[in-house]
């Protein structure tokens, strides 16, 4: 039995190694980061450097940086992000495939809903070290702007990866997400840990959806179901004959 289980594991690693790497790097690690940050915020109120980073950015404020931060934070507001996500989802449904439309819509829309839920649970108060140029209300953890921008960038990156123009998403997208996150800290409405949690949570959420919508995930699930059926024939039913793997 041990030899058979070990052989099944080796076969899974060989056949599905890219998907398993995506599960580890794109899904597990971001959630580990998010859970760690959330735990520190919950138990200790945040990281020791949160306040120092805010004060350093405010000490180096400048009119040009003020305008840049306001522009970036406006671009990451829920309304324009929601409109953009809705238009992109509709476009994918018309000109691409329904799974891609579902993937993109759930990536951005789901990230926004998750953000509201986490804010209500953690209930972290916003920093109030100076009067902000654009005050924000409700709770602070995690940054919805950072999470929405990261979800948009990550989803576009996955969708465009098979195409030649993928670098048009993989370079500006992360820069946009970084810029939006910086603007929230610069304006004094979020702690750096809020932004870090928003980024990590989005990458983990979108990566999870990418895996679930991947044909390789269904192949991997079928592979392990067949293996379990061979070991536990009376407990696990085999895949149906001719069962179609979703695209």
State each model region's role.
Residues 1-80, 120-134:
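N-terminal transmembrane-helix/juxtamembrane module of multi-pass inner/ER membrane proteins
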Residues 33-36, 116-126, 179-190:
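C-terminal ends of transmembrane alpha-helices
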